From Swiss-Prot:
This is NADH-ubiquinone oxidoreductase chain 4L. Its EC number is 7.1.1.2. Keywords: Electron transport, Membrane, Mitochondrion, Mitochondrion inner membrane, NAD, Respiratory chain, Translocase, Transmembrane, Transmembrane helix, Transport, Ubiquinone. The keyword Membrane applies. One of its GO terms (biological process) is ATP synthesis coupled electron transport. It comes from Trichosurus vulpecula (Brush-tailed possum). It is a multi-pass membrane protein. One of its GO terms (cellular component) is respiratory chain complex I.
Length: 98
């Protein structure tokens, strides 16, 4: 495993650990999800260029599009939650509360 692949794997693992550890605030969860998507994007682009699989060269762009959609929906949810409750706690998103 080259150092670039190792660094990207560590970046993905740290972002995943951040999602699991800092899950009380929505903003920190969204930032960690963006880190995961960015490391996946770079990994996919490097693997496609390394193995010369140019028939799947649109896959990183599609992943980037879904990442942008996820960021937009997440930020809209963050704005709506902070307007309603005054904070960005994930526990406010529980739909089973009365």
């Amino acid at each position: 495993m080259t150092s670039i692949n190792l660094n990207l794997t560590v970046a993905f693992s740290l972002a995943l650990a951040g999602v699991l550890i800092y899950r009380s605030h929505l903003m920190s969860t969204l930032l960690c999800l963006e880190g995961m998507m960015l490391s996946l994007f770079v990994m996919m682009a490097l693997l496609i260029s390394h193995f010369h699989m140019f028939s799947t060269s649109m896959a990183p762009i599609i992943l980037l599009v879904f990442s942008a959609c996820e960021a937009g929906v997440g930020l809209a949810l963050l704005v709506k939650t902070s307007n309603n409750y005054g904070n960005d706690y994930v526990q406010n998103l529980n739909l089973l509360q009365c």
